[in-house]
Design a protein with these regions (language model features):
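Helix-to-beta-strand junctions that scaffold the AdoMet/dcAdoMet cofactor pocket
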Residues: 98-99
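C-terminal catalytic and target-recognition region of SAM-dependent MTase-like enzymes
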Residues: 103-155
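A structural alpha-helix within SAM-dependent methyltransferase catalytic domains
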Residues: 7-10, 56, 91-95
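Conserved beta-strand segments of alpha/beta enzyme cores
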Residues: 15, 40-42, 130-132
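Conserved SAM-binding loop of SAM-dependent methyltransferases across substrates and taxa
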Residues: 2-16
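S-adenosyl-L-methionine
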Residues: 21-64
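Mobile active-site "lid"/loop adjacent to the S-adenosyl-L-methionine
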Residues: 23-25, 45, 64-93
Length: 155
């Protein structure tokens, strides 16, 4: 499923940028694009926060932003980070480059970002927009409920 959201956006004729700091994930996503018989996704090997900061300086706006950040990671230049430390900056910059009629979807998988924190940050950065925050659950093969993160959707 790597790059699935990018492929879906491209299949709807959206100009699509796929940003990831992990080259291997970009390679897999590109392969999925080709298997889906799509083309012209812009592949950006960079930290998403740095990309958003640069786009803000350029004055670029986006009709849609889909973020699926890991709970922690190592950036393109080997810098270590944790989502809970970068969440405010990430949401702030995303809010600034999101068109006023655009949408944003953000999944979080860090156990340190609970629903109330995500809602609080959404209020900080999207208070004039309609948004919702929900928990993500799935059924296991044995029928048990498994919590795996939270979702922010800005409309």
């Amino acid at each position: 499923y790597t790059g699935a959201a990018s492929c879906m956006a491209k299949s709807r004729d959206a100009m699509t940028f796929h940003v990831d700091s992990v080259k291997q994930l970009i390679s897999w996503a590109r392969e999925n694009m080709e298997l889906s018989e799509l083309e012209d996704i812009k592949w950006v090997h960079e930290d998403a926060l740095k990309f958003a900061q640069r786009e803000l300086k350029r004055g670029n706006k986006y009709d849609g932003i889909i973020m699926d950040p890991p709970a922690w990671g190592i950036g393109a230049k080997k810098e270590r980070w944790k989502l809970e430390d970068k969440l405010d900056d990430l949401m702030s910059n995303a809010a600034k480059i999101l068109d006023k009629k655009g949408f944003l979807i953000m999944n979080t998988y860090s156990p340190k970002i609970d629903l109330s924190l995500l809602e609080s940050k959404a209020n900080d950065h999207f208070s004039k927009r309609n948004f919702e925050v929900v928990e993500l659950w799935m059924k296991t093969a044995t029928g048990k409920d498994l919590f795996y993160g939270n979702l922010l959707r800005v409309k």
